[in-house]
Amino acid sequence: MKNWITKQTANVKSDILSGLTVALALVPEAVAFAFVAGVDPLVGLYAAFMIGLITSIFGGRPGMISGATGALAVVMVSLVAKGNAMGAPGENLGLYFLFATVILMGIIQMLAGLFKLGKFVRLIPHPVMMGFVNGLAIVIFLSQVGMFKENIKDAFGNNKIETHSTEQAMYIQDAKVYDSNTNVFLFAKSNSDLINPVNQAVIYQIEGNQVFDATSKEVKFNIEDNEIFNVEKTGISKQFLPRNELLLMLGLVLLTMGIMFGFSKYLKQAPEALIAILVVSGIAIFANLDVATVGSFIKDGGGEGLKGGLPSFQFELFSKIPFNWETIKFILPYSLILAAIGLIESLMTLNLVDELTETRGNSNRECLAQGGANIITGLFGGMGGCAMIGQS
């Protein structure tokens, strides 16, 4: 027992500092991946907290970090959007479908561990491993380009929404708006306003090639050559920061990288990444530099900031989602894809850490830990996750 305690506490200082570094690095990533998936930032933070904690205790590879990841988030976008479309506006049904999908994803991953399928990762050729690592590096680099951009505002001061035209809904002829299917007269057009002909109330306003609800200022349609189309929202319009702000941000990025790589041999007592984060954050705060923060990033994305408590059991999941064959048919394909991506990324990361440390992890145990973590995360309101090669 004494030897076990001695072994576990031999590097306690390095472990604490490394854990602090990873925690600070995970916050903005979890927030960003939550926005990618189309859910609240806290859903991403809950996933980072629960996945990371559970896999670190029960996983099969010491030194491997898990949390919300971009590879899973890009698959979740479609799931959340389709789920929301199945419910009433504002019901947020897509979020609950996401939780159910993550639970089923975890069950599939645990089955992979029980049937000892994790060992097959050893059969992956080395060139494939290198391609995986370099591909992820490119994806991570490209994902950072968005940090050098700012949201474009529309005519009403809100974030400008990018839209894609779908089917035609209405058309304009002789200053009158008609339904495209029935040719019924709907609105009168006066300048940029679409007016209810009965009570003369302004219902919609035209700004550029978009039609906005006059009350909520939310984009509802696209307009092209007197034809009005329904829309599919694809994101928030962005542009690169103004020159001075862009140069300031680039300077801080280069300073951070310089501390991490240029002074690594002088920073033996603490992780270089932690020192870089603390030093550059201190400069930005005490010099009162006008730069984006995690909080402002959340608000720019439509959130309200980092406000919330610990994750709680999602009792609403069982009343919101009908657990029948139709639900299974909807979430099963997403669960299979997410489970496969999560296990492949986790086991390839495990294999890479094995090579770096010249030790051997337990791939089947990692499958069980990843699956169990995702089940608990889904039940407690997280978006699920897997191993993160960058942090590991």
What does each of the following model-derived ranges do?
Residues 1-185, 189-201, 207-392:
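Transmembrane helical cores of multi-pass ion-transport proteins
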